[in-house]
Amino acid sequence: TVTCERRQVNRVYVSNKTMADGVEYIKVSAIGSQNDWSAFSEIWDSLPSKNTRAVILDLRGNGGGLIDAALKMANVMTPVKDAELAGVRYRDDMGGLEQTYSTGNALPLNKIVVLVDGGTASAAELLAGSLQDTGSATLIGSKTYGKGQGQFHIDLVNGDKLVITTLELELPKQGCWEGVGLTPDIQLENRKVTVNTKDLKPLDTSTTLRFGDSSDAVYAMTERLSLLGLLTEATGRYDGNVADAVASF
């Protein structure tokens, strides 16, 4: 005999991993509840203790979720105070346009990179697009899905479903992206790369690298740039191709 107890399961869709000294990878596969915001906030607040200087935020395959949770994530990553993050436009009889502005309390990071693809939609696009429009992050990947509207679903007695559009999401520069999607700053198609990080040369972040340098430190940096698709291969010389890759990152 098996006794089953029914209870609510609150799955968390946020995880993280330290990729290298000073570089944190955060995967948000959905923004399904406030638990995901809480998990993200806990990870984010831990970054100073790790001396984090760059963050890779992976939103690939994220179909969206809660708008307010996405805006909270965008806020803590936006360094400029009072920057318009996004607007939610309801019907006039439901309140009209509601705009959200940043508080300017973001961590002093050198870089935030957001990974997106065709599976990035809705609230995840809101998060990515807000960071892109405010200049807080660089988007890398392929064009996103293009869902910038919210709907209310009503089940009818005959089994049909009535879908009513109740809101439209708007970015400060790009406006509503419904049916259009977001275009990444650096366009790359998804690819699978299996890497044993133990095989990578240690990255010495205390060393200042300059154009023309040849060293193991340059090679270690270009190993990581090549994994991101910004270089075709690693090299020990800081040449023009490396400079372009660094500028793109």
Q: What is the predicted role of each segment?
A:
Residues 3-9, 167-169, 184-185:
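A short, sequence-level motif marking secondary-structure junctions
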Residues 171-207, 216:
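Primarily N-terminal secretory
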Residues 139-140, 144-162, 167-172, 242:
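BRCT (BRCA1 C-terminal) domain core and associated BRCT-interaction motifs
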Residues 109, 134, 157-164, 183, ...:
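Active-site lining segments that contact anionic ligands and/or coordinate catalytic metals
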Residues 10-13, 206-211:
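Long, charged amphipathic helices and adjacent flexible linkers at domain junctions
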Residues 2-147, 151-153:
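Cleft-lining beta-strand/loop regions that shape enzyme active-site pockets
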Residues 208-219, 223-249:
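Short acidic, glycine/serine/threonine-rich helix-capping segments at coil-helix boundaries
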